[in-house]
């Protein structure tokens, strides 16, 4: 299992939706969560309840993100991944300076 580090629930919801190339309206329709309620979750105005989380992860399309969303963990062999747009591991990458001249 690998760890990932996205902190806010709102940011995670947006990354999942954007990685699936969906609109907020499409997510609301797929999950059965009221559009305005879902938009509030994604905008960070209110935290998603456990019941809403169950609705969100019920569609098979979103199940692959469940461990990442809840525990900041992925397990690709078990089908648990992070969204493509999450840019996992960026802050742990070090760029080394090169003394080579270009041009």
Where are these regions (language model features)?
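A short, Lys/Arg-rich alpha-helix, primarily the initiator
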Residues: 1-20, 102-103
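Short, charged recognition helix plus adjacent turn
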Residues: 2, 67-103
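Conserved hydrophobic/aromatic packing and binding residues within compact polymer-binding modules
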Residues: 13, 27, 38-41
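Recognition helix of helix-turn-helix/homeodomain-like DNA-binding domains
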Residues: 32-48, 52
């Amino acid at each position: 299992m690998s760890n990932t580090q996205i902190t806010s629930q709102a940011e995670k919801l947006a990354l999942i939706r954007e990685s699936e190339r969906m609109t907020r309206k499409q997510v609301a329709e797929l999950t059965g969560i009221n559009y305005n309620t879902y938009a509030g979750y994604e905008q960070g105005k209110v935290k998603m309840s456990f019941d809403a989380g169950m609705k969100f992860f019920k569609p098979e399309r979103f199940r692959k993100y469940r461990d990442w969303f809840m525990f900041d963990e992925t397990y690709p062999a078990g089908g648990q991944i992070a969204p493509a747009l999450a840019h996992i591991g960026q802050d742990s990458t070090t760029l080394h300076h090169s003394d080579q001249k270009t041009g």
